[in-house]
Amino acid sequence: MKKTALTIITIASGSLGAVYFLPSEPAVQKDIRATSQHDTSVDNTSPKAFLDYSLSTLGEKPWQTITQDVVSEERALGELQLDEQLFALYLRYKQALADLDIEITGSDITSLETLHQAILDLQREYFSAQQIDLIFGEENQLRALALEKARLSEQGYSAEEQKQLWRDHLALQPEYVQESDANRRLMSELAQGEDAQTTYLKRVELVGEAGAQRLEVLDQNRAEFDRVFQHYLVQRSAILDDLGLSDEQKRQQIKMLRETSFDAKQWRRIEALERIADGG
């Protein structure tokens, strides 16, 4: 718990001195979330989760602002000594990771092992051993566990034998692996099949778990927006094609339709999309 800071005011009068201790106002924690993140909590479950959460605002916030926010959040970074150079390096790593061209063919264990090794090699290109351990240690361990699960499924064991061997293998892992939320989610994904496992591994490694979940929400929001906008265009076209309306009446009805179909903050965007739909 932080100790309350004290402001000391010393007033000297002749040979007498009086010292007053006045409690200062506690520092207000800066909200580093972007506008689109206000319905979420900052993901500081691990240094990597925090870095990925911060990077997901790129394009919405200036790079320099993101960097300053990240570097100032020492509590979320733990032992990781992060500066602007290391954060820029992390972004370059993420870009290189996205460019990895490795074909994954279903449950092919060789493909999964190739992906795992390629990720480890890429990490070594950009980071020291200590940085890799602090940033990627848990996810590397979880990915290795997923590979072990895949190997068990290819060795001819019965379903019950696989479950028992898997439990035995987990019992040998560090406590944080056995108890982590990420591990429980991984176990759920593994139980659904190898295709889900592969998707999980690639998404989490690219953007982190919180980032993957946020992208899924954004995808759903985009799909809903597209549905509403396409319906709006149909109604708008009906107004434009109505020969009984003057140009001014059409303009007013379309304006009313736009304002009742979308939030005020979207109106300028809708007008721009209308121009695109009209061919310019």
From Swiss-Prot:
Where is this protein found?
Cell inner membrane
Q: Name one GO molecular function term.
A: unfolded protein binding
Q: Which InterPro entries match?
A: Lipase_chaperone
> What transmembrane ranges does the database entry give?
5-22
Q: Name one GO biological process term.
A: protein folding
Q: Which organism is it from?
A: Vibrio vulnificus (strain YJ016)
Which family does this protein fall into? Answer: Belongs to the lipase chaperone family.
Q: What does this protein do?
A: May be involved in the folding of the extracellular lipase during its passage through the periplasm.
Please report the name of this protein according to its UniProt entry.
Lipase chaperone
- Grouped into one coarse class, the protein's main location is membrane
A GO term from the CC aspect: plasma membrane
Q: Which Pfam families match?
A: Lipase_chap (PF03280)
The record describes its membrane topology as: Single-pass membrane protein
Task: Extract the HAMAP family matched here.
Answer: Lipase_chap
Keywords on this record?
Answer: Cell inner membrane, Cell membrane, Chaperone, Lipid degradation, Lipid metabolism, Membrane, Transmembrane, Transmembrane helix
| Lineage of source species | Bacteria, Pseudomonadati, Pseudomonadota, Gammaproteobacteria, Vibrionales
Q: Spell out the coiled coil positions from the record.
A: none
